[in-house]
């Protein structure tokens, strides 16, 4: 019944950031040649002699369909003979989790490792036992069991063989693609994609392009949360840094909705920049911003920094040059109800940096409405207050009684903001790692226009006092480097930043920090350079 089949020797498909598909062991022909037993569909070397541990279902693979470019799901139907143990119900959990057996248990999608034992497979002596179960293994015969496993299975009623019908739904994406795609020099298959809402985004090498529709359909089939699979093309829009892409499976729908940092973002994925791998970095930076401060987001995109910061209670200037990004940032501002604390603009980043300090001073934000909470939150806070009073009373500490709280109709205001928002920027964000460093010259003299404002001079008691006392903003500049060692990366980044800022930036500058964000490619890392803007730069006189 069994046919001669290939062994899948491909790495797993990995979806980032949300989930990981099962891994298939990578075995080379040389490793097979060194096995003490012949390698067939089920035949395995004893565990103690195998150099490489196999995944639970590594000895079962789909039929080889190498070279096919169109997906035929019926081509993966297969009848497989497997070894199973007839076990009493009370023993099943103990045997399944036993160290000598757990790696032998059948592990295939939509195939149960434990099933009811058919009457025809139960031994005659045990047919009166109710509820017999079959514990299935990924082996075909008893001789393939390691000695330790045989010893443990002496507690089973019998070892039997059964035939299981497997099909397309029983194989994961790695196994299907491994059975279809030809071997390459690197012996790999398309290994990763990112998810953005309902869209799976792949970056296929040229050698896989003839198979792109098959690859896309398999990935779509095996990930029910996706509706669209796209492949990034080589064309990149230099000004706005987004890629052209092609739908290779599913709906031709680029309008994605993503939930991140407690906010909802909707945008057209085909003409704006969004990277789902950066959500932890977004959260890290936003955590540095106290509520009530002013943030200037120079390259805000659709708002991954600006929207959560505004929702947190910061006052945000969100700017981008891409009209589509600005359109969706405005839409997301409405969706997340942060209109009072997010001001959106569409100008060049160089100009935005130059005018932002004066903009905030001369046109400060209106005070934001106080944050509100529901009655449920109000009740939780009241219970917490009572608990603290009871603890104080038990400890013999004086207790101040408060008047009963009035019950509002729906919501109550808590912890109001300061009555007047700040008129100075606390943080600049420059999230365009490919070129943000080249925008640093715009900070030279960006505070000088404030010296012409009488209110600014009066606030600090004179021009020189203002230069000395005004609080300088933090600058967070994202960038790439080809240097992999962190020491060399720091030298490279600081040299380029110093040149563009016309100021010698060193690790000794105020509030300096260099944060490694992620590795983008084998010789390309992303960093966030943070420092407090030097007064000598901000107030420098041109000419």
Swiss-Prot record:
UniProt-annotated stretches for the region Disordered: 366-405
Protein name per Swiss-Prot or TrEMBL: tRNA (guanine(37)-N(1))-methyltransferase
Binding positions for S-adenosyl-L-methionine per the UniProt entry: 282, 320-321, 348-349, 431
TM ranges: none
One Pfam family named in its UniProt record: TRM5-TYW2_MTfase
Single GO molecular function: tRNA methyltransferase activity
Organism: Cryptococcus neoformans var. neoformans serotype D (strain JEC21 / ATCC MYA-565)
HAMAP family: TRM5
Main location per the UniProt record: mitochondrion
Lineage, opening ranks: Eukaryota, Fungi, Dikarya, Basidiomycota, Agaricomycotina
Functional summary from the UniProt entry: Specifically methylates the N1 position of guanosine-37 in various cytoplasmic and mitochondrial tRNAs. Methylation is not dependent on the nature of the nucleoside 5' of the target nucleoside. This is the first step in the biosynthesis of wybutosine (yW), a modified base adjacent to the anticodon of tRNAs and required for accurate decoding.
Reactions the enzyme catalyzes: guanosine(37) in tRNA + S-adenosyl-L-methionine = N(1)-methylguanosine(37) in tRNA + S-adenosyl-L-homocysteine + H(+)
Keyword Transit peptide tagged: yes
Protein family according to the UniProt entry: Belongs to the class I-like SAM-binding methyltransferase superfamily. TRM5/TYW2 family.
InterPro entries the UniProt entry points to: MeTrfase_TRM5/TYW2, SAM-dependent_MTases_sf, TRM5-TYW2-like_MTfase, TRM5/TYW2-like_N, tRNA_Gua_MeTrfase_euk
